[in-house]
Swiss-Prot record:
It comes from Meleagris gallopavo (Wild turkey). Belongs to the eukaryotic mitochondrial porin family. This is Non-selective voltage-gated ion channel VDAC2. The gene is VDAC2. One of its GO terms (molecular function) is porin activity. It comes from the Eukaryota. GO terms for biological process: binding of sperm to zona pellucida; mitochondrial outer membrane permeabilization; mitochondrial transmembrane transport; monoatomic anion transport.
Length: 296
């Protein structure tokens, strides 16, 4: 109740905070997007005249030679807030997802997710719920298992740029919490700070800053209780023009990653990347990546 009153006090509407999984996402994107080390990857997105979206993805691991692929079809029935999704991958796993949003209550999304593997006969089911409004973002998922369901819950509160979140998982088969995470952060238009504690033993933090319209930077830091090793990394992304950008990152293990993304034409994007081991430049072991995205 106190949260609701606090949200009504300002004259201007407060922003909806991100979900717990999206806390610190801007910094993670600078570290992860624009790279594809050790992979040759092709992504194709198309949309039919009837509104059905098709997404096909295929990748080959240059080290192992293993090829993975997936196909996803999605249809949105906007009038009723419904989304139907069918998935398949090369592990021969079939998935079906039905989501309904903003129909039962504004800001509430319910998702029914099932998977089935014909090869093994393994089945899984999950019910997901998410509710968001000014200052508040809640989530609760129930993952069904023969041994007993697992309940995943999360909550994020936001006020004047400050964010506080909690995430938990309760395993009913073991009758105990198997995940217990806390997070605190601060977010403005061009600056974000995020810190988290996972299970009381893993600590992490990240900083994201948009220095200019063309330059974005990020820093991350992580360590584990009882260990003297600290993981540290810095990354940056620079837009050369409206069609091209370069990315670079380095961590305390002397691993240097570089990436180049070029939009060749509308709907065609090429990504080149390389990972260099700074400790053994002459010994080899470096990785290259090639990605092509097609959208029509």
């Amino acid at each position: 109740m106190a949260v609701s009153l606090a949200c009504q006090a300002p004259r201007t509407p407060m922003a909806i905070p991100p979900s717990y999984a999206d806390l610190g996402k801007s910094a993670r994107d600078i570290f992860n997007k624009g790279y594809g080390f050790g992979l040759v990857k092709l992504d194709v997105k198309t949309k039919s005249a009837s509104g059905v979206e098709f997404t096909t993805s295929g990748s080959s691991n240059t080290d192992t030679g293993k090829v993975n692929g997936s196909l996803e079809t999605k249809y949105k029935w906007a009038e009723y807030g419904l989304t139907f999704t069918e998935k398949w991958n090369t592990d021969n796993t079939l998935g079906t997802e039905i989501a309904i949003e903003d129909q039962i209550a504004k800001g509430l999304k319910l998702t029914f997710d099932t998977t089935f593997s014909p090869n093994t006969g393994k089945k899984s089911g999950k019910i997901k719920s998410a509710y968001k409004r000014e200052c508040l973002n809640l989530g609760c998922d129930v993952d069904f298992d023969f041994a007993g369901p697992a309940i995943h819950g999360s909550a994020v509160f936001g006020y004047e740029g400050w964010l506080a979140g909690y995430q938990m998982t309760f395993d009913s088969a073991k009758s105990k919490l198997t995940r217990n995470n806390f997070s605190v952060g601060y977010k403005t238009g061009d600056f974000q700070l995020h810190t988290n504690v996972n299970d009381g033993s893993e600590f992490g933090g990240s900083i994201y800053q948009k220095v200019s319209d063309n330059l974005e930077t990020a820093v991350n830091l992580a360590w584990t209780a009882g260990s003297n090793s600290t993981r540290f990394g810095i990354a940056a992304k620079y837009k050369l023009d409206s069609t091209a950008s370069i990315s670079a990152k380095v961590n305390n293990s002397s691993l240097v990653g570089v990436g180049y993304t070029q939009t060749l034409r509308p709907g065609v994007k090429l990504t080149l990347s390389a990972l260099i081991d700074g400790k053994s430049i002459n010994a080899g072991g470096h990785k290259l990546g090639l990605g092509l995205e097609l959208e029509a």
